[in-house]
Regions:
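Glycine-rich nucleotide-phosphate-binding loops and adjacent flexible coil segments
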Residues: 226
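Phosphate-binding beta-alpha-beta segment of Rossmann-like dinucleotide-binding domains, i.e.
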Residues: 89-145, 157-160
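An N-terminal-biased, well-structured beta-alpha scaffold segment characteristic
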Residues: 2-94, 212
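Short glycine-/small-residue-rich Rossmann-like dinucleotide-binding loops
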Residues: 52-53, 195, 201-203, 229-230, ...
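Rossmann-like dinucleotide/phosphate-binding beta-alpha-beta segment
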Residues: 134-221
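Structural alpha-helical scaffold elements that stabilize or flank donor/cofactor-binding regions
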Residues: 40-41, 189-190, 215, 279-280
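Short acidic/histidine-rich motifs immediately flanking catalytic phosphotransfer sites
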Residues: 42-47, 67-69, 192-197, 220-223
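Rossmann-like dinucleotide-binding domain for NAD(H)/NADP(H)
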Residues: 222, 231-330
Length: 330
């Protein structure tokens, strides 16, 4: 079997090539993202493999189908970049539902600790032999209230970490987990009562810009926001205004709503044209990482193994829980 592999990075090759050789799968690696212009690169392949910022819209789906491709392999959990409605009945869409919930939950906590204990500032200062503690005062996590939006595997891992710090945890999820230890509250109450809010939910029409000017107004002054899920959960302009007004005490972002042409690439020699992102990065109380929360050895191995297994199952006519369909995703 041949697979057109888009948006390839060196760590993708390292994890997928050995599995491909062992399972008689030939990966054709392309650094380009999947778009209408690059879709023809998949001609002659049996499947297409994409990541979070590949654009699988209706036009791309039609191009792939015209070339005889019948399966789309997502090497990620999210599927908001795929037009599932248009793919229905044309392409089988298979995903990796949970490559490492620990990786993402731990990264969320790493961002939080870095922010509130000024680790990023201390690192830069001490490299210049500046050992002053001026403007380095943080705060304890113990006793603080953290709101967790989304209590799937990642959200629950983050909750367990927070409990280890002695934090009070409030939860919101439209589909609550069957766990009596979790304290669920309405979303507006979570926003109102939390000192820290961490997002671990998918991007849907309902969650798009769930953090906006109106919802920010209901939050505590000095609230800390963490987003390791999808960038468009947060209205970036509203966040910027909230930081400038000091309503938001800190923002810890591993994702950004307009990241697709910026993240995963070295832009150090270029002028960043996204003024909002540039201003956010310039803020002393904002930490931005480049969608790297998933990036651990364990997660990369799981992504590769699950993606290859999805393809082999498809070839054998076996479709399981990893299939994403329009009807199920609504």
């Amino acid at each position: 079997m041949k697979v057109a592999f888009y948006d390839t990075k060196p760590y993708d090759r390292a994890s997928f090539e050995p599995l491909g050789e062992a399972n008689h799968i030939r990966f054709k690696f392309f650094e380009d993202k999947l778009t209408e212009d690059t879709a023809p690169l998949a001609r002659g392949c049996d499947a297409v493999c994409v990541f979070v910022n590949d654009n699988v819209n209706a036009a791309v789906i039609d191009l792939l189908c015209d070339m005889g491709i019948r399966v789309l392999l997502l090497r990620c959990a999210g599927f908001n970049n795929v037009d599932l409605r248009h793919a229905s009945g044309k392409l089988t869409v298979l995903r990796v539902p949970a490559y490492s919930p620990y990786a993402i939950a731990e990264h969320a906590m790493a961002l939080l600790l870095t922010s509130i204990r000024r680790i990023h500032k201390a690192y830069i200062r001490t490299r210049d032999f500046n050992f002053s503690l001026t403007n380095m005062v943080g705060f304890d996590l113990h006793g603080k209230t953290v709101g967790v939006v989304g209590t799937g595997k990642i959200g629950r891992c983050f909750i367990n970490i927070c409990r280890g710090f002695g934090m009070k945890v409030l939860c919101y999820d439209p589909f609550p987990a069957d766990d009596p230890s979790l304290s669920y509250v309405p979303l507006d109450e979570l926003f109102r009562e939390s000192d820290i809010i961490s997002f671990h939910c998918p991007l849907t029409p309902e969650t798009h810009h769930v953090v906006n000017a109106e919802s920010l107004a209901t939050m505590k002054k000095g609230v800390v926001l963490i987003n390791t899920s999808r960038g468009a959960l947060i209205d970036s302009e509203a966040l910027l205004a909230g930081i400038k007004s000091r309503k938001v005490g800190a923002a810890c972002l591993d994702v950004y709503e307009e990241e697709s042409d910026i993240f995963f690439e070295d832009n150090s020699g270029h002028i960043l044209e996204d003024d909002t992102l540039a201003r956010l990065i310039s803020m002393p109380n904002v930490i931005v990482t480049s969608h790297q929360a998933f990036l651990t050895e364990e997660a990369l191995a799981n992504i590769a193994e699950t993606t290859v297994r999805n393809l082999l199952d498809f070839a054998e006519g076996k479709l399981g829980a990893n299939e994403v369909c329009y009807r199920c995703a609504k």
